[in-house]
Amino acid sequence: AQTAADTDQTHERTLFIVAMLKTLYLRVSELSERPNWQPAWKHFWQDSDGNQWLKVLGKGNKIRDISVPSALSPYIQRYQKYRASQSPNFGVNSALVAKNRGTGGMTSRQLRRIVQQGFDLGYEKMRAEGFTDEAKALREATTHWLRHTGASQDIATRPLKHMADDLGHASMGTTDQVYIQSDMKERARSGKSREV
């Protein structure tokens, strides 16, 4: 998505969606417009210590705040700049992920389609560069895969409670079961063939 956006600004939205889903461990529904929730730029906020947050409506209609890492800021600013160049009415009340034609935010189905197009572009690029085996993972990737990948990469460096809160898990046990125990199974599998 990064390469596509660097060469064609129409892919800025794809890059933003992919970065948000992976980095903030979002469910696709948390970026989508629903009858009871319209994700908007005003849902980004800063606390008194200067920490960045994003307010989302998650599973079970529960509102939660997700910590926004500094590394995501360039992607946010890049997409804001693009959106401002496309719409003179762009502002804090604008949809977080807007349609190219029409008004308002996007549905989960529309977001999935955009991400899939990004995966398809990545797949073709990787194949063209000779990374055929690695490219196969993108053929099977989903929006939820981005959430899982982001969380799996971060689980070793963040407290379990913080991960559970950002993931929107009601229980740390869920986070432990999905990310820690599965990591231990993988560790055991990779460790079986060690030599004495």
Which residues does each predicted region cover?
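A short, basic/aromatic helix-end/turn motif that makes direct DNA contacts
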Residues: 33-44, 154-157, 164-171, 178-181
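DNA/chromatin major-groove-contacting recognition/catalytic segments
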Residues: 165, 177-196
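Conserved tyrosine-mediated DNA breakage-rejoining catalytic core shared by Y-recombinases
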Residues: 33-76, 84
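Short, basic (Lys/Arg/His-rich) helix/loop patches that form interaction surfaces
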Residues: 5-7, 112-165, 172
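Conserved hydrophobic/aromatic "anchor" residues
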Residues: 78-79, 150
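Basic, Lys/Arg- and aromatic-enriched nucleic-acid-binding interface segment
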Residues: 1-28
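Short, cationic motifs built from Arg/Lys/His that form the positively charged side of catalytic pockets
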Residues: 13, 26-29, 59, 64, ...
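C-terminal catalytic core of Y-nucleophile DNA break-rejoin enzymes
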Residues: 58-78, 92-117
